Regions:
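Accessory "access/gating" subregions that flank catalytic or transport cores
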Residues: 167-208, 364-365, 370, 390, ...
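Histidine-anchored nucleotide/phosphate-binding helix
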Residues: 235-249
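Local cysteine-cluster metal-coordination motifs and their immediate loop/turn environment
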Residues: 29-48, 66-86, 186-196, 305-307, ...
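Gly-rich Lys/Arg/Thr-decorated short loops/hinges at beta-loop-alpha junctions or inter-strand turns
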Residues: 35-36, 149-164, 216-228, 331-336, ...
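Iron-sulfur (Fe-S) cluster-binding modules
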Residues: 1-35, 44-47, 51-68, 85-184, ...
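Short amphipathic, charge-patterned alpha-helical segments
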Residues: 57, 242-246, 394-409
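Hydrophobic alpha-helical positions that pack around
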Residues: 138, 267-393, 405
Length: 438
């Protein structure tokens, strides 16, 4: 178990060590080779790439170079992706056989491997992430740590303000103050229905009952959707921190993450993160000496599409057939085992810590009058830049597909885009100017 003073020391020391991850002008001789370990790049041999880098560095006796696994960088069309910091060099479609050349040319000789540098859709070489249109129009809140930190290292999460929001919540805020902050921010559920998050927390807190639960819906069933999976794989602790904040706010001491078994990397990293948080005293009894107890367990889903519906999910957690319940009563009144239960999805939770740290006014300044903040999209199909994007609410679908996604390949004409899976609508060229809002 770590004291608050120890956590502060970890944050201070580790943040200085990791400054080169976010600062291209960092004054350091050290280099970090970041290798994407999201599901897409993992399926294309990124673990082998990482091991080859480490082996070659060891064989050559090279110092001041670290090789780190990260979550998804977003531009899945260019994977496996390797980024070298602090210079921010972007190597695309790297193979295990390329590692020797990258080490010799880039690390030892100080030159880039031009044939591996990322190219935009016009064939122009791109030296860094910031030079790509894919990233220029994005604003990352839920994805802020994805591709930056090692999701299996709690110290790296702590270095980038991890668990500061939970500390502030427990030490400086009452449960009602937390709920008021979330309400004022204008955050709405990112699972599709768009119900005001703060209102849902308020209703669950107001429900009578000594036992309450916090549930994370990570059963992402829509075809082609990998937003929640990528957050769980790339910034796992952000979800745990938000669930603990939610538990404090509504009066719950137990949380469940319901995740489909088809997400083995996410499940593995969730368990690693939970174990680390318990070891540090961030989950368990008397967190931060506040008399607040909270713990989290994982529950695996069997892949049934219907279990993405919140009451069917609750039935599944209870060990029953995943079948939706008649509402009302709603989960806030009678949820898991008949107790008041708060349910939010992964992306919703991924915004919570940033709202607590930066304030409701900051969050509500992003987006539109009725839809605040950002939205994460999984961009797939016949588009040049397939991948994961996060944009402010109010961004048009045309901007997402053309300005960020690079448009339709081979100059072909756009026909239609589908949003939100089989239950949502198709947008034709005529309606393509519409903005996304909840």
């Amino acid at each position: 178990m770590k004291s608050l003073e120890e956590l502060h020391k970890i944050r201070e020391n580790k943040r200085s060590e990791l400054d080169l991850r976010v600062n291209t002008k960092a004054d350091t001789r050290e280099k970090h080779i970041l290798v994407c370990h999201g599901t897409g790049c993992t399926s294309s041999k990124s673990p082998e790439i990482l091991e080859n880098f480490r082996r070659i560095i060891k064989e050559k006796g090279i110092e001041n170079v670290r090789v780190i696994k990260t979550g998804c960088f977003g531009l899945c069309a260019k994977g496996p992706i390797v980024i070298i910091r602090p210079e921010d060099t972007f190597y695309a479609m790297v193979t295990p056989e390329d590692c020797e050349e990258i080490i010799q040319t880039h690390i030892i000789e100080g030159k880039t491997v031009d044939r591996l540098l990322c190219k935009d859709i016009d064939g122009k070489i791109v030296n860094s992430l910031d030079d790509l249109n894919f990233y220029k129009k994005q604003k990352r809140i839920a994805l802020k740590n994805c591709g930056v930190i090692n999701p299996e290292d709690i110290d790296e999460y702590i270095a980038f303000d991890g668990y500061r929001a939970l500390e502030r919540t427990l030490k400086e805020m009452s449960p009602n103050e937390v709920i008021d902050t979330i309400k004022k921010s204008g955050l709405r559920g990112r699972g599709g229905a768009g119900f005001p998050t703060g209102k849902k927390w308020e209703l669950t807190r107001a429900s009578e009952g000594k036992q309450k639960y916090v549930v994370c819906n990570a059963d992402e069933g829509d075809p082609g959707a990998f937003m929640d999976r990528s957050i769980l794989e790339g910034d796992t602790h952000s979800v745990l921190e938000a669930m603990a904040i939610a538990g404090y706010s509504i009066g719950a001491n137990k949380g469940y993450i319901y995740v489909r078994a088809e997400y083995p990397i996410a499940v593995k990293r969730l368990q690693i993160a939970i174990d680390q948080a318990r070891d540090y005293g961030i989950l368990g009894k008397n967190i931060f000496e506040s008399n607040f107890d909270f713990d989290i367990e994982i529950r695996l889903g069997a892949g049934a599409f219907v279990c993405g519906e919140e009451t069917a999910l609750l039935e599944s957690i209870e060990g029953k057939r995943g079948q939706p319940r008649v509402k009302p009563p709603y989960p806030a009144q009678s949820g898991l085992w008949g107790k008041p239960t708060l349910i939010n999805n992964v992306e919703t939770y991924a915004n919570i810590a940033q709202i607590i740290l930066k304030g409701a006014d900051w969050f509500s300044s992003i987006g539109t009058e009725n839809s605040k903040g950002t939205k994460v999209f999984a961009l797939g199909g016949n588009v040049n830049n397939i991948g994961l994007v996060e944009v402010p609410m109010g961004t048009t679908l045309r901007e997402i597909v053309y300005d960020i996604g690079g448009g339709v390949p081979n100059g072909r004409e756009f026909k239609a885009a589908q949003t939100g899976g089989p239950s949502r609508r198709m947008y034709s060229k005529r309606t393509f100017r519409y903005t996304y809002r909840l």
